[in-house]
């Protein structure tokens, strides 16, 4: 994947915030179970499928994907090489790489799911990133999105999701609306 200025590297504070035990606890006990519940409610099963973890950071979310969903392949990337080095230390059977979400290193229609654990708000060209996710998704592929409030005007964000070629199957608010979670599917 090419490195570009379209994605923003985390500052020191945010790097530490994303790699702390409280964040991992929230991922494991709140955020990821919510994604699992959404998938189950819509009878979407990703076991044995190809999953992309966009902006994987140190790989904690990637590890949850591997352990809980049991995909056949996981492609995980982050723009920060230091995050990828941390992710590789987890010893997972995952294709970790440094990459840019606005130019994903995957063939068209090659992934059954793309996960966004709070990455889009770091990317000025977030609409282009959504279009890239649609490009790599198979015809009925899904994208799971978790983003914080105040980073987006939600009406504009949902319109961007739809304009990229995704239909919103479900949306949920968390922590009094501070976070929003979306289960979307590539529109046919």
Describe the residue ranges of each PLM region.
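N-terminal, positively charged/glycine-rich alpha-helical extensions of SAM-dependent methyltransferases
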Residues: 1-19
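Conserved SAM-binding loop and adjacent beta-strand
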Residues: 20-37, 152-153
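A short acidic, Gly/Pro-enriched loop at the edge of an enzyme's catalytic core
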Residues: 102-114
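A short SAM/SAH-binding and catalytic strip from SAM-dependent methyltransferases
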Residues: 113-125
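A short glycine-rich, Lys/Arg-flanked "PGG" loop and its adjoining helix->strand segment in the class I
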Residues: 127-139
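Conserved beta-strand signature within the Rossmann-like core of class I S-adenosyl-L-methionine
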Residues: 141-147
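Core SAM-dependent methyltransferase catalytic element
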Residues: 174-188
């Amino acid at each position: 994947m090419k490195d570009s200025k379209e994605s923003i590297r985390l500052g020191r504070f945010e790097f530490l915030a994303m790699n702390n035990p409280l964040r991992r606890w929230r991922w494991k006990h709140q955020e990821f179970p919510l994604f699992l519940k959404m998938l189950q409610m819509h009878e979407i099963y990703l076991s044995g499928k190809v999953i992309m973890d966009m902006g994987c950071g140190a790989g904690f979310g990637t590890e949850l994907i591997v352990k809980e969903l049991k995909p056949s392949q996981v492609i995980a990337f982050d723009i920060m090489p230091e995050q990828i080095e941390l992710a590789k230390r987890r010893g997972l059977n995952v294709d970790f790489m440094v990459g840019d979400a606005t130019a994903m290193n995957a063939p068209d229609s090659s992934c059954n799911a793309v996960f966004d654990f709070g990455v889009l708000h770091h990317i000025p060209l977030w609409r282009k990133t959504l279009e890239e996710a649609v490009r790599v998704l198979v015809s009925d592929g899904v994208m799971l999105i978790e983003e914080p409030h105040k980073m987006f005007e939600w009406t504009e964000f949902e319109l961007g999701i739809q304009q990229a070629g995704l239909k919103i199957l479900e949306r949920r608010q968390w922590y009094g609306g501070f976070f929003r979670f979306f289960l979307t599917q590539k529109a046919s």
